[in-house]
Regions:
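FabD-like malonyl-/acyl-CoA
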Residues: 1-146, 274-305
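Glycine-rich phosphate/pyrophosphate-binding beta-alpha loops
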Residues: 60-62, 202-204, 257, 261
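NAD(P)-dependent dehydrogenase/reductase Rossmann-like domain
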Residues: 218-219, 297-314
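Alpha/beta catalytic cores of group-transfer enzymes, especially the acyltransferase/condensing modules
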Residues: 11-12, 105-254
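Alpha-helical scaffold elements within enzyme catalytic domains, especially in hydrolases
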Residues: 20, 34, 186-189, 266
């Protein structure tokens, strides 16, 4: 059985996420405690107690990434106990999730990755400050139609770009919120079932984040290891394994669209099963891209379900 590990991005946060792993897995608990000490973020409070910080990008990003890494730590602990070998053929993350994937691949210490995505969230927010940035999801419209509308808009001075290629019939565009809103009718006239502004104050994966990409390199360079297991880049939908590639691709990731569906299609032949850590968002998207099964490890019950499958198919 060949596995691929996948990691979700921003938007899947919820109060209480990771609690079962923290309370029942020693490695997961140690991970959270060490991350809190290293970053200065009170992750127990951030993840487990109601509050506004969980929806602020500079805290949302490390919270989601930590939850993913705790789920992975809990799986590795149980797999070792049950003498199961569950090593990925490749790793892939959606947006923020590429950093989780890189850490899980051995490219960065988890605590350093969490500090980095905390900074990444702050840089993204700062780059969009005062620019009226936003994002919009377009449903049931072909990629080419979305791209043409965006290209026509940018040629007339608007700031609108395709940002996330999630699956056929679901694409997210980013740019100035007013420009996005002005195009809502055009997307629908072209055949979109829905064109809805998202509750976002940043415009991810588009040229509005150019300054954030430049600054991110300064923090990324000392944190990266020289080589690691294959990680599929959001910006190219191709795998990379070295620090020099990571520096180029993670900077590009901020200003380039997330090629998620292209990544799954390019590499699904190398895996029999996808395993998502910390949320069940990509599981739903994968159903529209591939016939290969996807398991989402979000709590002890879903961990048990995956381990049962892995034992039956070893």
């Amino acid at each position: 059985m060949k596995f691929a590990f996948i990691f979700p991005g921003q938007g899947c946060q919820s109060v209480g996420m990771g609690r079962e792993f923290y309370e029942n897995s020693d490695p997961a608990r140690a991970l959270l405690d060490e991350a809190s000490s290293f970053t200065g973020i009170d992750f127990k409070n951030l993840l487990f107690e109601p509050g506004d910080k969980l929806d602020v990008s500079e805290f949302t990003q490390p919270a989601i990434a930590l939850n993913s890494m705790m789920a992975l730590a809990a799986l590795q602990e149980r797999a070792d106990q049950e003498k199961l070998s569950i090593a990925p053929q490749f790793l892939l993350g959606h947006s923020l999730g590429e950093f989780s994937a890189l850490s899980a691949a051995g490219g960065m210490e988890p605590k350093q990755m969490l500090k980095l995505v905390n900074i990444r969230g702050r840089l993204m927010q700062s780059a969009c400050e005062g620019k009226g940035a936003g994002m919009m999801v377009i449903l049931a419209l072909a990629d080419e139609a979305v791209e043409k509308i965006c290209a026509d808009a940018t040629s007339s001075g608007k700031q609108v770009w395709a940002a996330n290629y999630n699956c056929d019939g679901q694409i997210v565009v980013a740019g100035k919120k007013d420009d996005l809103a002005a195009l809502e009718g055009e997307f629908k006239a072209a055949g979109a079932k829905r064109a809805m502004l998202l509750n976002m104050s940043v415009a991810s994966h588009c040229p509005m984040l150019q300054s954030a990409g430049d600054e991110l390199l300064e923090f990324l360079r000392p944190a990266l290891k020289e080589s690691f297991a294959p990680v599929v880049a959001n910006a190219t939908a191709r795998a990379y394994t070295t620090k020099s590639e990571a520096l180029e691709l993670l900077k590009a990731q901020l200003i380039s669209p997330v090629l998620y569906k292209q990544s799954i299609k390019n590499y699904e032949g190398e895996a029999d099963c996808f395993v998502e850590f910390g949320a069940a968002v990509l599981k739903g998207i994968n159903k529209k891209i591939t016939q290969k099964p996807t398991f989402s490890i979000t709590d002890l019950a879903s961990l048990d379900e995956f381990l049962k499958f892995a034992k039956e198919n070893r």
